[in-house]
Amino acid sequence: MVGGEAAAAVEELISGVRRATDFAEQFRSYSESEKQWKARMEFILRHLPDYRDPPDGGGRLDQLLSLSMVWANHLFLGCSYNKDLLDKVMEMADGIEVEDLPQFTTRSELMKKHQS
């Protein structure tokens, strides 16, 4: 009987993961590559329980989606944001592994190189 209960628990867990993934899929941007989306979806799913909208609304989910875009735009496109905001999203993304990130040169770095 224990084996049957374990199998049922595993099936329930897998079903929950599928539902969460299906839910997150609606937020994928048309222009996101598979690599960008997988990273951003992990960010969203990791924090979804903390950002669920209360029954009366509140926009918590919108806030999470915005934070996920800030993080992805910074990582993949080199966008810069307010230091406090970047610190927050980088802390939220701690532990999310993304391979082969593009390398960006900032304007300041270019100016220093040019002046040398």
Curated annotation (Swiss-Prot):
InterPro entries: XTBD
The protein's assembly and partners: Interacts with XRN2; the interaction is direct.
Sorted UniProt keywords: Acetylation
Stretches assigned to the XRN2-binding (XTBD) domain: 24-116
Name of a matching Pfam family: XTBD
Species per Swiss-Prot/TrEMBL record: Bos taurus (Bovine)
Protein name, per record: CDKN2AIP N-terminal-like protein
The family this protein is said to belong to: Belongs to the CARF family.
Record bears the keyword Acetylation: yes
Modified residues (N-acetylmethionine): 1
Top-level taxonomic group: Eukaryota
